[in-house]
């Protein structure tokens, strides 16, 4: 069978400024990649935090001081430091300070339970943990059962404008919590940790193959796993991003992203933005859409990076619709599907062709495919393989390439592909075969090299031997005029052991009443659109 992927049909769809491949990847560490911005635009705003502007000069200084603090705590190159924070200035200073000290960053969701937090701290072997004061009670339950020796406590109020800090405290609008000493563990406020520390650059050398990030993911199977991303993974991916977007000039852009640093998309895109000398609008609470709109109106971002659900909510807001989007170059959408019809509606507000759907994974730093910046964007497609990235679709059973237009598992090679999961040799053996990383995602490719995600392998529903992709069912349901959101799963078929039936949960649009008549109306619609075994 002909391997249609060997000829890389996507190359013909690359923008004119994008070469077929990259041959001159930088040989430097993640911390070294930041120096161009710190040295080149020191007076430019690096972060805007609820009205407080922090320059690249101050960012450089605070992150240097935190790196010195880590070394004072006995941290050495390769030691793991956990960041259990939302997007506040201290999180960014700490993240870059971790890299400057040669340590390994692991992002920890603030939504984790105490048990889940303990698991990640133990699995990663973290020596230092940064957390909020309002999460201290959760942390203290488990931190003594881990290798953590130092807990650095951050407040939402840190680095706020003085007036907002005072008013927020008086009106009790700033989440806070009491902290106290812990047995055999040093507990210190972030402000005290960096106070009086040297401001000069830390002299720590790390190699390209040394670990940079340990980001936790479900992987393709099983419990959360630490995906180890090297310095080269991150730095090479920055080069891929610059080449792909054509954004090369330092200090020209402003980026707004609601992705948290503990999520790999938020983590990498923040590193890329810092290295680009871009100003970042910190969106600490992504649910506060009115604040987001006010910040966008005042600070005029040129790039927005968010999940589809956030864009869906913004679309409903009068304040968002009233904004001037002429200066926004593109809206990146990733981490979950963005229904095609909704993209069309969104672009009626922000401008035709401005949504850039991307696809990736924690294990790939994260991007694998993206729609072109200036070329053809196919609505519903996650785009074409990024420059320097090889992608194939294979039969999960045989590993052989599938024909054009047929669904197959995405496998990938590239400088952004991680080296493996932390202490998980069996999972690594299962995920890497013949040099290709198997993603567990199913897609189709068209004749132009554009990829269309179909589903996760594990999310396929098996109905009497027929394979049903839940995302396909969701997309068709979402096209119904009465449906706002849909989610499809497979549940055991009580009449056929070993088989499943398709079940969908739907949210009706405002004004549509839930009733048996409405249910039957939707069922009839689905019977007209899909095969009988796919009808929920």
Question: Predicted segments — roles?
Answer:
Residues 26, 43-82, 86-88, 95-96, ...:
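Conserved AMP-binding/adenylate-forming core of the ANL superfamily
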Residues 235-254, 262-303, 317:
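Conserved AMP-binding/adenylation subdomain of ANL enzymes
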Residues 301-306, 317-377, 390:
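Gly/Ser/Thr-rich phosphate-binding loop
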Residues 72-73, 100-192:
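Structural core segment of the AMP-binding/adenylate-forming
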Residues 384-388, 400-430, 468:
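Conserved ATP/PPi-binding loop(s) of AMP-dependent carboxylate-activating enzymes
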Residues 112, 129-131, 414, 419-420, ...:
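AMP-binding/adenylate-forming catalytic core of the ANL superfamily
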